[in-house]
Each structure stands twice: as structure tokens, then as C-alpha cells.
Regions:
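N-terminal low-complexity, intrinsically disordered segments
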Residues: 2, 24-26
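A well-ordered secondary-structure block
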Residues: 82-178
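C-terminal motif of bacterial Sec signal peptides marking the signal peptidase cleavage site
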Residues: 19-23
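Aromatic-enriched hydrophobic runs in primary sequence
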Residues: 7, 25, 70-74, 96, ...
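Short, well-ordered surface patches within globular domains
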Residues: 26-92
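Bacterial N-terminal signal peptides that target proteins for export
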Residues: 1-11
């Protein structure tokens, strides 16, 4: 009986892993899958900080996103552009920042972006965004050290511009009330 339970548990774990790796998860949208993968990553790295997905401003971010801000490989923001913006790049970054102004008093407000080739799984997108891309810091308030976090807000969307797809992720670290 114990052997049967172990075999069934292993089979279930295998099916769940296959579901995650292939991106087939009971009809969940790609946006929600990306958010869940990020939530898993941040919950493992941030302790018991609750993670929510309520960032309605992601729509305004998507409307104001300009692909010219991306690095030449399409993964993450161009570090030269975000650290020394001029001309239209400066205007485009200001539009993104303005879309997230409701969170200006949060600990950190990050924006991740990348071009998404057809067929790239959500898990691969998250891996590339977290480990191989430069993010844009719209706001940061960490003077005096990193405060205790009340929650982390995370939202994702896939936007089409100029015939290409782009994954946008907003990550907001909300400080605990003092």
C-alpha cells in the first residue's frame, strides 16, 4: 500500500512538472502563469511576504511602452538608455514612470520587459527576465536601509507593438506601515 501511494505521488509530481514545463495549466493565461512563477520565486526569496497581483496600472504601462528602450538582444532594458536617457528615450521612460506614480512611496517599483519570440514558454520568459535582463527602477525609497515589506505586488501582460510581442512585468515592494 505504501509503495502504491509513493508511485502515485511520483506520477502526480511528474504530471505537475510536465504541466509547468509545457505551459499547459488548466487554461490559465500566459500573464497569470508569469505572475505565478514570479510569485513562487519571490516568496522563496522574500520569506512570508504576501504576493498579490492587483496592479491595474499595467495597462497604462503597456500603452506607454516603447520597444526602443530594450537592449539590442531584446531581453531587458538597454542599460545605457535607462541610466543616461536623452531625447525620446527620456520621454518614454517618463511616461512609464508616470503610469506608476501611485506607487512612488513604495520601497521599490521595478519594470521588466523583453521581446517574446513565438513559442517561448512563460517559464523561460521569467527565467530570462530574472537572470538575464536589466530592469528599470521607476521609484526607490530605501534610504536608511531596506524596510520590512508588507507585500509584493506583481502584474504581467503581453503586448503587441509593431508586429512583435513583448512581455512586461511590474514588481512593487510595498513597505510595512511604520
Amino acid at each position: 500500500m505504501k509503495l502504491t501511494k509513493k508511485l502515485l505521488a511520483m506520477a502526480l509530481a511528474g504530471v505537475m512538472l510536465l504541466t509547468i514545463l509545457t505551459g499547459c495549466s488548466s487554461g490559465k493565461s500566459g500573464d497569470r502563469l508569469v505572475e505565478e512563477y514570479l510569485a513562487t520565486f519571490f516568496s522563496e526569496n522574500s520569506g512570508d511576504v504576501p504576493i498579490t497581483h492587483d496592479v491595474p496600472e499595467i495597462k497604462a504601462v503597456a500603452e506607454n511602452f516603447d520597444p526602443s528602450l530594450l537592449a539590442s538582444n531584446g531581453i531587458g532594458f538597454d542599460a545605457k538608455v535607462i541610466h543616461n536617457p536623452t531625447g525620446s528615450a527620456s520621454d518614454n521612460l517618463q511616461k512609464l514612470k508616470s503610469a506608476l506614480v501611485n506607487y512612488k512611496n513604495c520601497t521599490n517599483v521595478y519594470l521588466y520587459a523583453m521581446a517574446v519570440p513565438e513559442g517561448l514558454s512563460e517559464l523561460t520568459q521569467v527565467t530570462l527576465l530574472l537572470y538575464y535582463s536589466s530592469y528599470y527602477t521607476a521609484y526607490t525609497n530605501t534610504t536608511g536601509g531596506l524596510p520590512t515589506l508588507d507585500s509584493i505586488k506583481c502584474a504581467s501582460t503581453l503586448v503587441k507593438k509593431g508586429g512583435k510581442q513583448y512581455r512586461l512585468v511590474v514588481l512593487i515592494q510595498v513597505p510595512a506601515a511604520s
